[in-house]
């Protein structure tokens, strides 16, 4: 593999609970197994954890994640999802792990930007005019490096009512902005509890499997699949590869 290839793991939708128990939506052992598999692979430059860390808004759920993060040796970036208590998460998780919308992180040939789509108390996502302005300002002024955008809600329709109802509601405003910049190469999101990859114009949109459980693809009703995993991204100079890893 090329030396300048950036290797990323995406972990999403852990839904941890206050106790280390196997509830239907809080899978402590799943999360442990995912991080163990990532560590054993020994190949990643960065890990993005794309929201819904907690399922019950408890301090202990974030403490569980923190104990797992302490065992990792590569850079880790954590963002909130609609199930998270952002203030509590920011209190428990050290700043070095938190990805701020105010900053642009550069690594090799890419810039990485976090867009906060979370609306307090709501399932859907939304970007305010201020959020959109800040985001476009970053794209306009951060140079010519290729861009990777990280967020929780899906910013592109999946043609599935259950998730398109609760996606980033003003996704068209977001898409309008990124279409102005041909160096936006990758948008990583969570929320949808499965592995999706969609190409739109010059940009690849991609989600990882949930750590807790999957919602079966292409079904009109919610059908739970008791499997879990994470997703690898290989960012080469001229192209991007993805690889979904199923633990179970």
UniProtKB/Swiss-Prot annotation:
Transport is among the record's keywords: no
GO MF annotation: an example: metal ion binding
Class of enzymatic activity (EC top level): hydrolase
InterPro entries, per database record: Calcineurin-like_PHP_ApaH, CNP_phosphodiesterase-III, GpdQ/CpdA-like, Metallo-depent_PP-like
Residues given in the record as Fe cation 2 binding sites: 52, 82, 152, 191
Pfam families the record matches: Metallophos
Cofactor binding note: Binds 2 Fe(2+) ions per subunit.
Enzyme Commission identifier(s): 3.1.4.-
Record keywords, A-Z: Hydrolase, Iron, Metal-binding, Nucleotide-binding, Plasmid
The organism's place on the tree of life at top rank: Bacteria
Cofactor requirements of the protein: Fe(2+)
Residues that coordinate or bind AMP: 15, 52, 82-83, 193
Keyword Iron on entry: yes
Sites where the protein binds Fe cation 1: 13, 15, 52, 193
UniProt family annotation: Belongs to the cyclic nucleotide phosphodiesterase class-III family.
PANTHER family referenced in this protein's UniProt entry, alphabetically: CYCLIC NUCLEOTIDE PHOSPHODIESTERASE CBUA0032-RELATED (PTHR42988:SF2), PHOSPHOHYDROLASE (PTHR42988)
UniProt name for this protein: Probable cyclic nucleotide phosphodiesterase CBUA0032
């Amino acid at each position: 593999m090329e030396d300048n290839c950036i290797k990323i793991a995406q972990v999403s939708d852990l839904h941890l609970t206050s106790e280390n128990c196997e509830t239907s939506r809080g899978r402590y052992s799943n999360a442990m197994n995912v991080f163990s598999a990532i560590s054993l692979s020994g190949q990643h430059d960065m890990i993005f954890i794309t929201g819904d860390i907690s399922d019950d808004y408890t301090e202990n759920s974030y403490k569980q994640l923190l104990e797992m993060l302490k065992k990792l040796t590569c850079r880790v970036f954590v963002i909130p999802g609609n199930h998270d208590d952002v203030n509590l998460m920011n209190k428990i998780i050290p700043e070095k792990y938190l990805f701020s919308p105010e900053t642009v992180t550069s690594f090799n040939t890419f810039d990485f930007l976090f867009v906060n789509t979370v609306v307090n108390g709501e399932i859907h996502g939304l970007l305010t005019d201020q959020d959109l302005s800040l985001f476009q300002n970053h794209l306009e002024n951060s140079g010519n490096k290729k861009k990777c955008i990280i967020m929780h809600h899906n910013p592109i329709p999946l043609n599935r009512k259950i998730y398109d109802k609760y996606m980033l509601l003003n996704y068209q405003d977001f898409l309008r902005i990124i279409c102005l910049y041909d160096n936006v190469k990758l948008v990583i999101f969570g929320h949808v509890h499965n592995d999706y990859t969609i190409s739109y114009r010059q940009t690849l949109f991609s989600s990882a499997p949930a750590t807790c459980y999957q919602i079966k693809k292409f079904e009109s009703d919610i059908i739970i699949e008791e499997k879990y995993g994470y997703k690898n991204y290989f960012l080469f100079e001229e192209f991007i590869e993805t690889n979904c890893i199923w633990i179970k």
